[in-house]
Curated annotation (Swiss-Prot):
The lineage of its organism: Bacteria, Bacillati, Bacillota, Bacilli, Lactobacillales. Its EC number is 6.1.1.6. Belongs to the class-II aminoacyl-tRNA synthetase family. Coiled coil: none annotated. This is Lysine--tRNA ligase. Mg(2+) 2 binds at E414.
Amino acid sequence: MANEEHLNDQMVVRREKMQALRDQGVAPFGHRFDPDHDLSTDIRKKYENDSGELLLAQHNVVTIAGRMIGKRGSGKASFADLLDRGGKIQFYVRQDMVGEEAYKLFKESDLGDFWGITGDVIKTRMGELTVRAEKITFLSKALRPLPDKYHGLQDPELVYRQRYLDLITNRESFERFQTRTKIIKAVRRYMDDNGFLEVETPILENIASGAEARPFVTHHNALNIDMYMRIATELRLKRLIVGGMERVYELGRIFRNEGMDPYHNPEFDTMETYAAYFDFNDVMKETEGIFKAAAGVVADDLKITYQGTELDFSTSFKRLHMVDAIKEATGIDFWQEMTVEEARKLADDNGIKYESWWKVGHIINAFFEEKVQDTLEQPIFIYGHPVEVSPLAKINEEDSRFTDRFELYILGKEYANAFSELNDPIDQRKRFEAQAQENAEGNDEAQPIDEDFVEALEYGMPPTGGLGVGIDRMVMLMTDAKSIRDVLLFPTMRPKK
């Protein structure tokens, strides 16, 4: 609550009004109220097409509740706007209908206050659907004034810090978060309909594994051990495949102690899925289905627009090997066998920076990221990643330098990552050991050896296809949001000084 010494004039007046309510026997912060219409949209859907004459004749009485965000009129009659989670609806208050005492209470109330309204549905001469109040109930006092209704919150920092004010003043933002929930429901429905079981795995882990990322570290006092916030759910979910669950998915929060930009937040939602007897081609089909389900929430024809570019999810997504993509863009042919020295020379000649510990596969991946990725517009599967950057993916049978892995790219950004999963425990141990060596050579994001996971693989894991989808990025895409912060209700922020 605001320090009494720092109250502005409006806040002082509102506190005086709060006390006046108490003096009149009116609770400034009420208890339960029972509207018979949950949403203003219910009223609009039911009565919008009725004529004013018909509505007057029917005398349809409703009870609604919400925040007053506008008030107009003088004398003994006023109009006001009520905001609930369905949107805005107008109500009309007359002293001779609600009584002098109630009308005085209404006139003295402020924008931001909550009211319950009972009355009949009418249309004004301008044709606006309106609830004509027969009874009004004061529900809750707002002690701070709302932002200007015409301009809302202008400071992006305040939008993210005070999301509640953004939701009140920016209907587009409010509806974006409603759409987010609908998209997640549609994705879950698709997974459930295709025989996947939703599961939950630990957020606190003894070892940070499943991705190349820097973890958050915490301490468990009772066990007196350091633990890690999970950076992926992969290895837990694959243990469940070993256990016979066959098709599983988890949609939940991941934590990575890394940088922040319009596409990255330290905590974010992903969905990982694993299906026994799938290979990465099957997972491509699954991925298409997931994105079509999401696009269907916002566009019946599965064609959406993101930042001015139309994207078509109605057709099959293009598929292209990473090496072929590089060759198309640069003319360089990485299908040819080469030494790391030869690869480094190609990198030097083309302005590609590299680390001292990089192998040929790392340089191939860097060429793709630097020369190809930003050119990819429509949904496309890039497959065949080098072994060096895919420690958990199955080696391709035809060329052991590459893996049966793909990523989905749209408008130059990665939206999904998938493999034919590595199920050979001996190969898996070798790759973990190679990652440990990279860590020793300076790659602080390389994965440690997860002995328990290797042991699980030794009991046998069937051929499996796995997928990871960034849910926040997907929602950004489908709702035309510029930043990941626009689809997270409470994004990570530096504390206010």
